[in-house]
Amino acid sequence: MGKYFGTDGVRGEANVELTPELAFKLGRFGGYVLSQHETGRPKVFVARDTRISGEMLESALVAGLLSVGIEVYKLGVLATPGVSYLVRTENASAGVMISASHNPALDNGIKFFGGDGFKLDDAREAEIEALLDAAEDTLPRPSAEGLGTLVDYPEGLRKYEKFLVTTGLDLGGMKVALDAANGAAAVSARNIFLDLNAEIAVIGDQPDGLNINAGVGSTHPEQLQALVRESGSAIGLAFDGDSDRLIAVDENGDIVDGDKVMYIIGKYLSQKGELAKNTIVTTVMSNLGFHKALDREGINKAVTAVGDRYVVEEMRKNGYNLGGEQSGHVIIMDYNTTGDGQLTAIQLTKVMVETGKSLSELAAEVTIYPQKLVNIRVENSMKDKAMDVPAIAAIIEKMEAEMAGNGRILVRPSGTEPLLRVMAEAPTDDEVNYYVDTIADVVRAEIGLD
């Protein structure tokens, strides 16, 4: 990660940290870097979610791009994966998404995609950061025909919707409950599932600029659970603010998280011989029950660090086509290059139609183990050295021996804070509490600050 670019672009409180001035510079410097690696005038797609700050930042970003001669196509409100899709299929040089995903309305972010639809590579981000840190802006200032042009491109949304519909099956009147998180999916999810011949009930589709992710969406599925029960829906589908993740709800109103969604889609692809290398890419935070279910099906796993960027890196490196996270980021590389909540939702309903099984039946094959996570404050200098402390290493070894393979312990440093995270999974709540609390007590005694 750089000074400005984190794992998911540049983020911060809108108009405080992520200011119009910074957005202008990101557009200007980002556009210039793109132009240095292109022949001809670069073409860039720009989209945003529904945050009140989106239009402010969009205006500044677009002005910056135009100031260095970029041809800008303004997509309006669109899901992050929609930008990725359009960049690839319409031969754009890059795409920019203005969103802070599942964060509250006061935050926003700016994320660049390369012409291949993947996140802009680290080398390009470093070039942009170097310009941001320069003492003065010495870039060319073209005039007249050298300036960029702006094209409003609302048809991009419908092209993305049509693409998504082609990946699904006729749902034959299936009752589907949707939660668009008052975000980007509010402009598309309804249309997509109506085109798939679903009978729909919708919440979270009235964005006002301030209510994105507020009590709705994939991080707050409670309203959707109630809607599924009240409406008698066969499935509930909750997206986040930029629709790059999905949390599902079965017909009983129970949560079906990213692990279960990946298992259901992965098993379906495996049985059809379409799961690349018969492998699913997941992170160290995936539940042990998910791993055991894959083992029963003979499906392989590739495990990465936490973060969808690491999942995507592993998929690209080894040619895998399915991966994701427990949080609902699911990447189906046969169709798109990034997590896509609406695409994942369509594939989930496709499995239901083709198997004739309810979502609860499909999800029941994964027994989710109780999981507990405790954060312990430590010195930054110690969080990467915890396993070098003999007492900590010994207690972890002792607890793992007691588990005898029927549980899991993960002790890892936070990537951004002076914290050590202690996580365990076991068959019962009592067991998981015992394992985590025992290890946490030793960690606190040896290196804890509290």
Curated annotation (Swiss-Prot):
Post-translational modification comment from the UniProt entry: Activated by phosphorylation.
Alphabetical list of PANTHER family matching this protein: PHOSPHOGLUCOMUTASE (ALPHA-D-GLUCOSE-1,6-BISPHOSPHATE-DEPENDENT), PHOSPHOHEXOSE MUTASE
Chain segments annotated as coiled-coil in the UniProt record: none
Active site (UniProt): S101 (phosphoserine intermediate)
Keyword Transport listed: no
SUPFAM superfamilies reported for this sequence: Phosphoglucomutase, C-terminal domain, Phosphoglucomutase, first 3 domains
Cofactor binding note of this UniProt entry: Binds 1 Mg(2+) ion per subunit.
Organism field: Streptococcus thermophilus (strain ATCC BAA-250 / LMG 18311)
Protein name: Phosphoglucosamine mutase
Cellular component GO terms held in the UniProt record: cytosol
Transmembrane regions listed in the UniProt entry: none
Pfam families: PGM_PMM_I, PGM_PMM_II, PGM_PMM_III, PGM_PMM_IV
Catalytic activity: alpha-D-glucosamine 1-phosphate = D-glucosamine 6-phosphate
Modified residues (Phosphoserine): S101
A molecular-function term among this protein's GO annotations: phosphomannomutase activity
EC number: 5.4.2.10
InterPro entries in alphabetical order: A-D-PHexomutase_a/b/a-I (IPR005844), A-D-PHexomutase_a/b/a-I/II/III (IPR016055), A-D-PHexomutase_a/b/a-II (IPR005845), A-D-PHexomutase_a/b/a-III (IPR005846), A-D-PHexomutase_C (IPR005843), A-D-PHexomutase_C_sf (IPR036900), A-D-PHexomutase_CS (IPR016066), Alpha-D-phosphohexomutase_SF (IPR005841)
Record-level GO BP terms: carbohydrate metabolic process; peptidoglycan biosynthetic process; UDP-N-acetylglucosamine biosynthetic process
Cofactor(s) needed: Mg(2+)
Family: Belongs to the phosphohexose mutase family.
Superkingdom of origin: Bacteria
Keyword annotations from UniProtKB, A to Z: Isomerase, Magnesium, Metal-binding, Phosphoprotein
